[in-house]
A protein has these predicted regions:
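Juxtamembrane membrane-interface segments at transmembrane alpha-helix termini
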Residues: 59, 76-77, 129-130, 179-186, ...
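Short, aromatic-rich membrane-interface segments at the entry and exit
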Residues: 113-116, 164-168, 186-193, 235-245
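A cytosolic-side transmembrane-helix exit/cap motif
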Residues: 134-141, 189, 212-215, 259-269
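Membrane-interface helix caps and helix-loop-helix hairpins in membrane proteins
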Residues: 110-112, 131-136, 179-189, 230-239
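Alpha-helical transmembrane segments of multi-pass integral membrane proteins
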Residues: 106, 226-328
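Membrane-cytosol interface segments of multi-pass membrane proteins
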Residues: 1-178, 273-274, 295-343
Length: 343
């Protein structure tokens, strides 16, 4: 008898919103530091914050896990049609991303930008080889994740059982190494990134056991996460150390059910709009740059703190307002369609 890996409402892992919230704040801090050229020294600004660039891999692993929670069993049991599955992906992503692309084009219009906007609006830009799109440049992560969405039915087949999933993970890890050392394909390539999505799927297959372990043995799970963090900085940010850290972080998160730094109203709120914040934070930075506010203070540290806070707060405000505006537009269009159909 085939074992079912059904994800129910009881499988709601409250800490994941907090994990995503801290990850997006870290990525925003990294981008502000990298683009602002503040000339600040020390471990925090020379190694810690720059390392936050690799938190995108954590997002990929969480995406793999989250998609499995929502759709794995539906795909396996054919309880969702191909049309409904892909419609939901486009409806969730396209309106907000299209709005951002339009704003980016207005801020920096050019023929090249127009071409890139057209590519972005298809959400298929992740299929382009070495696209290096500058319009919403951070959306390369979205491009990779959307290719993952395209391949998700195949992904469900790959992790159809635990034994096969482990074999696929080994192959994906080898492929990751080949991409980096032979094919010269980096993190903007789905094959390079596949290992993170697959490990997210593996964690889904063992989610009940891992959540129980992390819940009962929080100190041990926290210690493993600390060891993974130290290993990352001691051994370097390679695929193995990043996988170790991402797995440790996600497993620790599965055991967080109430209270603490990962489960609280602020973390839940930020985690709920982390996708929007991620896509818009560099647009907010460019606006501040055009207003000559990124170096408002002569002191590099003060200038960085001000800019980072302004970017994060501005991104939150923009995300909330944009979602409100798009919801109003959607409601208006639905009402118009209803009236036309009624007539």
């Amino acid at each position: 008898m085939r074992r079912e890996f059904v994800a129910t409402k009881a499988d709601r892992y409250e800490g994941i919103d907090g994990l995503k919230a801290y990850a997006i704040i870290g990525i925003a801090l990294m981008h502000v530091l990298a683009n602002g050229e503040y000339g600040i020294g020390g471990f925090v600004f020379e190694r810690l914050i720059p390392s936050f660039t690799n938190l995108v891999f954590l997002f990929m692993m969480v995406s793999g896990f989250g998609m499995c929670c929502g759709y794995y069993q539906k795909i396996i049991d054919q309880k969702i049609s191909v049309e409904d599955f892909y419609k939901k992906r486009y409806i969730k992503i396209w309106p907000y991303f299209a709005l951002l692309c339009a704003l980016d084009f207005v801020i920096s219009p050019s023929k090249e930008s127009l071409f890139e906007v057209i590519a972005n609006l298809t959400l298929c830009q992740g299929l382009l080889p070495n696209a290096k799109i500058s319009v919403i440049g951070v959306s390369w992560t979205l491009a990779v994740i959307f290719v993952f969405y395209m391949l998700f039915p195949f992904f469900c087949f790959l992790i159809g059982n635990k034994k096969r999933a482990w074999r696929v993970a080994v192959v994906a890890l080898v492929f990751n190494w080949l991409c980096a050392n032979y094919f010269k394909a980096g993190r903007t390539n789905i094959v390079y990134d596949a290992i993170y999505f697959i490990v997210g799927g593996l964690i889904f297959l063992y989610r009940k056991e891992l959540a129980e372990f992390a819940s009962k043995h929080k100190v041990i799970a926290g210690a493993i996460l600390l060891i993974a963090t130290v290993a990352y900085f001691a051994l370097g940010g390679n695929t193995l150390t990043m996988l170790f850290f991402c797995v440790a972080a996600l497993v620790y998160t599965l055991g967080c059910k109430r209270g603490g730094v990962l489960v609280n109203p602020v973390a839940k709120f930020l985690g709920g709009i982390c996708f929007e914040i991620y896509l818009c934070h560099m647009v907010i930075y460019r606006v501040l740059e055009k207003l000559h506010l990124v170096h408002l203070f002569e002191n590099g540290l003060l200038a960085y703190i001000f800019t980072a806070v302004a970017v994060i707060c501005g991104s939150v405000v923009f995300s909330v307002c944009a979602k409100w505006f798009l919801n109003k537009v959607e409601t208006f269009l639905k009402e118009r369609v209803r009236r036309v159909n009624h007539v």
